[in-house]
Structures are given as structure tokens and as C-alpha cells.
Amino acid sequence: HGLPAQCPNADGTMVHTCCLHGMPTFKLNFDSHFTIKTVVAQNGTELPESILPEATIDRIPPSSHDLESVRGNLVRKNVDRLSLQEVNSLVHALKRMQKDRSSDGFESIACFHALPPLCPNPTAKHRYACCLHGMATFPQWHRLYVVQFEQSLNRHGATVGVPYTDWTYPMKEVPHLLTSEKYTDPFTAVETFNPFNHGHLSLLSPET
């Protein structure tokens, strides 16, 4: 497998390791086409060629194929470490999400978290909040809820995951992304409302 070099035989004038680590000696690469004719064991015994079957190809890959677009997992970053581009993508994604009135929109997902009570269904006589606050299974439920919110943000154009605040570090104020009522796009200089500060929920009030 390695040293000392003993191939093709230990007494040869030009010996090399018996493993394929010595391929450069023969000016071979791993994609070179070659056939092993002689195998010499560590003790110098020459092994017959029949011991190693002829190499075969189990699968011939296609010369070309369609590439399936796959989006990777989103990275969740500390809110204080977001770049201008990342904040910009989050703000515009949340704005689009708030305008979406489908089940993938902000209002539908936000209401599912608490009020108004919509479970077991919106038309039931006795309804309750769909969240599991105060229950032992709340952590598991909330993890899935954050993923649902995050995936919706991504489908609406966010390039990063839901940002977080690191509670292990002292913090003197709430992040500016949440407290500022206005947001100025650093690339267009257009000032609009900040969707992370307030938004529209028709089932509760005009602005929340």
C-alpha cells in the first residue's frame, strides 16, 4: 500500500510503491485508460492476471442532461450582521408577502400563530387559536411555524433566512430593522414603510 517501494520487484533498479499512489511514475492519471497485466505481491510472488477480472463499466453516464434547479437551505444570520443587500431582500420579500392574500401570504400565516381564532376551522361555532402556546409541544410546533414563514419569505424573494437576535449578548435596544417606521432602499433611495415595523391585517385592524 505504501513504503518501502517494492514494485515491480524489490531488487529492481526502478522500484515504486505497489499501490496506485505511484501512478505519476507511469505518467498516468486517475482518468487514464490502462489495464493491469502483472500483479506482484508484497513478498515478491507474481500473481496471475486471472486473479483480477477485466474492468467493466456498470453505468455509462449520458453525455448531456437537463439540470434541475435546486435551491439550497437559507442561512439564518444575526440581525446585526445582515448586509445592505440582505436587509433589502428581506424588506421587499416581506412587502410582497403582505400583499399576498393566498395561504402563502403574510396574513394567513400570521393569523395561524394566534388571533383571530381559526381552529378547528374558521366557520366553527367554538374556535380557538391554532398555535400551541403554553403546551409541551410548543417548541416543536414553533420550529415548523418559523420554517413555514421562512419558506414563504424565500418564495417571495428573500435571499437569507429569518434573522435572529442573539440573547447571549447584551443588547441595549431593539434592532433598527424592527423599530424604524420607514425604510429607505439603499439602491434606489426610495423611502417606503418598513414592513418589519407594521403591516396590514384585515381581520384585526387596518394597521398592526
From Swiss-Prot:
Any one Pfam family here would be: Tyrosinase
Please give the Gene Ontology molecular function terms for this protein: metal ion binding; oxidoreductase activity; oxygen carrier activity
Instruction: Kindly give the InterPro entries that the UniProt entry links to this protein.
Output: Di-copper_centre_dom_sf, Tyrosinase/Hemocyanin, Tyrosinase_Cu-bd
* Record cross-link 2'-(S-cysteinyl)-histidine (Cys-His), residues: 19-21, 131-133
Q: How is the cofactor bound?
A: Binds 2 copper ions per heterodimer.
Query: What does the sequence similarity comment in the record state about its family?
Result: Belongs to the tyrosinase family. Hemocyanin subfamily.
Q: Which domain of life is it from?
A: Eukaryota
Cofactors: Cu(2+)
Q: Where is this region: Unit F?
A: 75-208
- The cysteines covalently paired via disulfide bonds are 7-18, 119-130
Q: Which PROSITE patterns match?
A: TYROSINASE_1 (PS00497)
Give the span(s) annotated as Unit E: 1-74
The task this protein performs is described as: Hemocyanins are copper-containing oxygen carriers occurring freely dissolved in the hemolymph of many mollusks and arthropods.
Q: Quaternary state and partners of this protein? A: Decamers of large identical subunits (390 kDa), each containing 8 globular oxygen-binding functional units.
What is this protein's name?
Answer: Hemocyanin, units E and F
Organism, as annotated:
Sepia officinalis (Common cuttlefish)
Q: Which residues form a coiled coil?
A: none
- Glycans attached where? 43
